[in-house]
């Protein structure tokens, strides 16, 4: 089925196709180009709980990720300043590769990432929390103030005491006024029954009113001294004589009839 004139080239044959020659030269140039590039090693970050505090007295600069012709090699750009701490501490990984990013130090001029070192690129203040950034410290402050107010409640400078609203013009609170009113209530009721009510002035207990005069009482006592019971005609005569009604002519010994 195969013709004898067709033969496959041997593996040891020096003849190669032009396509294979071009492909091999391109791959060789690519390998040569790769060998000229220096790949930066990937950073291995340590967990925050293994970091150590470092004192800082100058501005901390962020790394410059791009090199521009007008910038010097290794110097951070002026816009890269993050904050300016004074006498504070920063947390950063411990190790010989850590370098503080101060423009005045010569170690900060070693390379692009010299401001943050080869181990880390993030610094945090020595605040209340070692895991969260320093911006979350204000929430811890607010929480601490709330706990203090719960333990020792007080009145803020701009706040008005609610008890002052309930005070009367005399300076007594509503509770004190309610206590005094409850004590004085029975006495006022007794005075009201006895005197029939009085104005805004303080009431004094008065004696019961007597509807008879002294002369009328003497005449009635004289009449009832000899006769305990009198008839209707004699009652009418005494009423006209003493200028009383028939119902008012009673025995003076019965005090309830004289005092109403």
From Swiss-Prot:
Alphabetical UniProt keywords: Developmental protein, DNA-binding, Homeobox, Nucleus, Transcription, Transcription regulation
One GO MF term attached to the UniProt entry: RNA polymerase II cis-regulatory region sequence-specific DNA binding
PROSITE patterns, sorted: HOMEOBOX_2 (PS50071)
Family: Belongs to the Abd-B homeobox family.
Biased composition (Low complexity): 1-14
General function of this protein: Sequence-specific transcription factor which is part of a developmental regulatory system that provides cells with specific positional identities on the anterior-posterior axis.
DNA-binding span(s): 205-260
Pfam families linked: Homeodomain (PF00046)
Source taxon at top rank: Eukaryota
Name of the encoding gene: hoxd11b
Signal peptide residue numbers: none
Coiled coil: none
InterPro entries from the UniProt entry: HD, Homeodomain-like_sf
Disordered as annotated region, ranges: 1-21, 151-206
Gene Ontology CC terms, in alphabetical order: nucleus
SUPFAM superfamilies: Homeodomain-like
Chain intervals with Basic and acidic residues compositional bias: 167-179
Name of the protein: Homeobox protein Hox-D11b
Localisation per UniProt entry: Nucleus
